[in-house]
Design a protein with these regions (language model features):
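N-terminal binding-site loop/beta-alpha segment at the start of enzyme catalytic domains
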Residues: 1-70
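Structural preference for beta-strand elements that scaffold enzyme active sites
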Residues: 3-5, 13-17, 44-45, 69-73, ...
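Glycine/proline-rich, positively charged
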Residues: 26-29, 36, 79-193
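Conserved short secondary-structure transition element at the edge of the structured enzyme core
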Residues: 39, 128, 152, 182-186, ...
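Short beta->alpha linker loops
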Residues: 50, 54, 76-79, 140-144, ...
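Active-site phosphate/pyrophosphate- and oxyanion-stabilizing loops and adjacent acidic/basic residues
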Residues: 57-61, 89, 147, 202-203
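Short low-complexity, flexible loop/linker segments enriched in glycine and/or proline
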Residues: 61-63, 151-153, 173-175, 199-203
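N-terminal glycine-rich cofactor-binding segment that shapes the pocket for flavin-like pterin cofactors
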Residues: 65-76, 83
Length: 218
């Protein structure tokens, strides 16, 4: 079983993550069954978001009683500290847990930093100090924001689209993350369904140390 360590987080898991966006489209019973089946097959990293309707609720039920055996990453699209705390408390309640392993800013239009006026990064630091989150990450679709986040040294993980149809700029992001000891979580490994050869898609991702692909079951 191939394993991956997400940079300086120290999180080491099976090099297949579970993308929990699609489970919002199926029943609670089916979603819980699917998540538990993935767990039994050796998957330990599960990625969701506050914006994914009831995805967090479904994962919360799936891992109730075995929370310490999985890593859960979720996200907030908050624009200010007040929204951040509201989202975090809701996520913790939905997930039936008192901590999130990786709490990610969800595709912000800018790179949250201390003193930027949004209060977002300061809130994340406070949440980490309180033990409510363990690591601070960011997701994005913009190369400029992703690069700024890596070079800032403020983030422990980056989640970004990455597949075998990615170009040189995406490959450079992976290398930058490695240089900064930052975990790279690869979303859209099948490019939103454009790639149909899953074996080839995985073989591509497996070449890169520190890259964790998350797959969504459609």
């Amino acid at each position: 079983m191939d394993m991956v360590t997400l940079g300086r987080t120290g999180i080491t898991v099976n090099k297949n993550g579970f993308g929990a966006l699609p489970i919002q489209r199926i029943s609670q019973e089916d979603a819980v069954f699917l998540a538990r089946k993935a767990y039994k097959a050796g998957i330990r990293f599960f990625d969701t978001a506050r914006a994914y309707t009831d995805s967090e609720v479904k994962l919360g039920e799936a891992f109730d009683g075995i929370r310490s055996e999985v890593y859960i990453a979720t996200k907030t699209a908050a624009q200010n500290a007040e929204e951040f705390w509201k989202d975090l408390h809701t996520s913790l309640n939905n997930l039936r847990t008192d901590y999130v392993d990786i709490y990610q800013f969800h595709n912000p239009s800018f790179c949250p930093k201390p003193g930027d006026g949004s209060g977002l990064y300061e809130a994340a630091l406070e949440a980490r100090e309180k033990g409510m989150i363990r690591h601070i990450g960011i997701t994005n679709h913009r190369l400029s924001v992703a690069k700024e986040a890596i070079e800032s040294g403020l983030y422990e993980t980056l989640q970004f689209p990455f597949s075998y149809i990615s170009g040189e700029q995406e490959l450079e992001l992976v290398q930058l993350c490695k240089e900064h000891e930052m975990g790279f979580i690869a979303m859209k490994g099948l490019s939103g369904g454009l790639i149909t050869n899953s074996a080839a898609a995985y073989a591509f991702e497996a070449q890169f140390e520190g890259v964790l692909p998350i797959w969504g079951v459609q």
